Structures are given as C-alpha cells and as structure tokens.
C-alpha cells in the first residue's frame, strides 16, 4: 500500500489546479493543528490564510493591515509587518545573526517569483559576505540545489531542494567544452557528506555563457534531428553536458522567458513552492511579491511564476 500526505490549502503544483495524487482515492482529513502552539499568534494568520483559500476571501491581508505585530507572553513567537525599508533592514539583521552558522534553516526569505528569490539572494549575499563581488561563488557560500545529480552507481551527489556549503573551490576550465568556471566540492548541511567535485559555470564570463548556449542548442538540435536508433544516445549527450556544466543563474530569451534554468542558487531565499513543509526559526515573507505582480495586479495563478 502507498500512503500519500497532502494539504489542499497549500500552493498546488505549477500549472496544476490540484494534485493528481489525490484524485479518485480514499482519503481522510486531519483537522487538529499541531505545528503551532495555541498561544502562537502565527496560528491566527495560518487559520485566516486557510479560510481565504477555501472561501476566496482576503481576511489575511485585512488582518495584517490592521494588526502590525503580535507576540506571545515570552516574546519568542509572533509576527511583525514591515514596510519595504524596514524589511530590508531586518533581513540584513537576521542573516548577520551567528545562529545561521549553526543552523542554515534559522532564517529564510520566502518569495513567490523566482525573480524575487534571485534578487533577495543577491542582496543578502552582498550584504553579509565580504568581497562577494569578486567571485560568483566562494568558500562557505550557502547553496541550494534545484536538481538531483547521481553518480554512475545511481547514488545522489546532490539532491533537489537540499542545502550545501561550499567546502573547496578552485578555478577551472572544462577540458571537453572549454568553458570557464569553478570546480567545487560541497558539504551537505544535513548529514555532512562531502560531494565529489562538480563544475559550475562562471556566468560573469560572457564568452563562456555564449558558448554554453551554443553547445546546448547544438546538442538539442542533434538530438531532435537524429535517426530513431541513435536519438536516445544524442539526448544522453545533451544531459551529460547539462549535468557536467552547472548554472547558478537562469539564461533568458530576449522576451524575458527562460531558455535554460539554473541548477543551483544561493540558499538565503526560497520560493513559496519550495518552502512548503519546511520549518524555519524566522520566516521572512515577501508578501508584496506574493500578492502583486510588477504591474500592481494580484497574481491570478501559479503559472505566472517567472
């Protein structure tokens, strides 16, 4: 038997209204709240949000517009609503706390769009890492993987949504593709395992980025145009290239859409999709990015993530 656990008040999968995993199966609903104590003011917020999801209301936004902060008697559990300037200041303060060196889940910035996640990662890294502008990746950088990569024995080297610390780093030019970048060993935040070396593209090198796109485009065309008996081999060559030359940034088209998605990102901010199910000591939610698009209109659905 297979038991699946879900929450119909969470954000659905991208481009899906509901999860297919829960269609046409026997289900049981658990209603007791256990993740927040009864005296935790955050519990009120989550109950309002859940009600808004079910009823199509905006009670959560109305509530935080009237109640700018609330804490329990110990002043250790609660929330504060900030304006943009205050939020930035608080972000720098929280990520400068020594607690994050012992617990990388101590604090996260949570945004709706991938663009906002990238902007926050850049802002935080430049705020807390000395000389961060000198290199796209440095020793002790906090990195989140957006992909799972396995070795020849099908054992995971890095896993999707897991956090890693840069353990060792060296400048490197890929011997096969002649792309500039860095050879990096990561250490898993949870478990402490050190990975085998992985090659990361230096996205500040314009020639390297142009050649990356050319190689990837050529390999895709070769696979699409290949005879049926060798098509699988051609696609394997493309994915071998992708996994051996990892990206820290998205590569976009002129119209703003994404051509090639990043494989890794700095681990200070996270999308609301990826954050679901996680627990942080301090959650810094970019409500404006979640509620409004760049034109000041509410997001109609999850497909608007960019």
Task: List each model region and its residues.
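C-terminal accessory regions
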Residues: 177-306
């Amino acid at each position: 038997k297979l038991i699946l656990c879900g929450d119909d008040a969470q954000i659905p999968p991208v481009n899906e209204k509901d999860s297919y995993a829960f269609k046409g199966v026997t289900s049981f609903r658990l209603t007791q709240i256990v993740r927040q104590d009864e005296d935790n003011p955050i519990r009120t917020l989550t109950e309002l949000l859940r009600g808004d999801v079910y009823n199509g209301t905006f009670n959560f936004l109305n509530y935080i517009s009237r109640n700018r902060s609330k804490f329990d008697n110990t002043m250790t559990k609660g929330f504060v609503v900030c304006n943009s300037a205050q939020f930035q200041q608080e972000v720098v303060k929280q990520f400068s706390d020594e607690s994050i060196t012992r617990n990388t889940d101590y604090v996260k910035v949570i945004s709706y769009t991938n663009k906002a996640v990238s902007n926050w990662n850049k802002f935080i890294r430049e705020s807390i890492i000395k000389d961060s502008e000198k290199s796209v990746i440095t020793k002790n950088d906090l990195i989140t993987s957006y992909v799972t990569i396995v070795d020849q024995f099908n054992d995971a080297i890095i896993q999707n949504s897991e956090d890693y610390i840069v353990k060792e780093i060296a400048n490197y030019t890929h011997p096969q593709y002649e792309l500039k970048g860095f050879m990096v060993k990561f250490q898993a935040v949870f478990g402490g395992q050190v990975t085998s070396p992985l090659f990361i593209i230096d996205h500040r090198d314009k020639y390297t980025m142009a050649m990356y796109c050319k190689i990837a485009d050529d390999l895709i065309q070769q696979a699409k145009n290949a005879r049926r008996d060798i098509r699988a081999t051609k696609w394997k060559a493309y994915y071998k290239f992708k996994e051996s030359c990892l990206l820290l940034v998205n590569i976009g088209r002129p119209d703003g859409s994404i051509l090639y998605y990043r494989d890794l990102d700095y681990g200070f901010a996270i999308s609301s999709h990826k954050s679901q199910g996680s627990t942080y000591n301090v959650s810094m939610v970019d409500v404006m990015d979640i509620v409004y698009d760049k034109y000041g209109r509410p997001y109609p659905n999850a497909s608007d993530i960019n």
